[in-house]
Amino acid sequence: MNDSEFHRLADTLWLTIEERLDDWDGDSDIDCEINGGVLTITFENGSKIIINRQEPLHQVWLATKQGGYHFDLKGDEWICDRSGETFWDLLEQAATQQAGETVSFR
């Protein structure tokens, strides 16, 4: 994967997250902001999830209250380089915990 392909894939990921949060109809207030390639999700209780891209490594990084995760693209899924879990699984687990209700991005 070259840098432009990586950025295209990361942009698609960011757009999907933003669209899902725009459609969010849960009880919690969840905000999403993109600034300089960093996507910040802020929850009603003040907690945050930070997602950023690491261009030199062609990785997506996810920072949550539970910890930090690094994802490599394998096939068509972003996979955690430590646990083997998918990006969407870990994001949904963290968002659900931080929102206090079920949050789905798929």
From Swiss-Prot:
Highest taxon of source = Bacteria
* Gene Ontology molecular function terms on file: ferric iron binding; ferrous iron binding
Q: Known InterPro entries for this protein?
A: CyaY (IPR047584), Frataxin/CyaY (IPR002908), Frataxin/CyaY_sf (IPR036524), Frataxin_CS (IPR020895)
Pfam families attached here?
Frataxin_Cyay
UniProt entry keywords in alphabetical sequence: Iron, Metal-binding
GO CC list: cytosol
Q: Where are the transmembrane segments?
A: none
Its Gene Ontology biological processes? iron-sulfur cluster assembly
* Iron among keywords: yes
Query: Family assignment?
Result: Belongs to the frataxin family.
| Name of the protein in its database record | Iron-sulfur cluster assembly protein CyaY
Q: Which organism is it from?
A: Escherichia fergusonii (strain ATCC 35469 / DSM 13698 / CCUG 18766 / IAM 14443 / JCM 21226 / LMG 7866 / NBRC 102419 / NCTC 12128 / CDC 0568-73)
Tell me the name of the encoding gene. Answer: cyaY
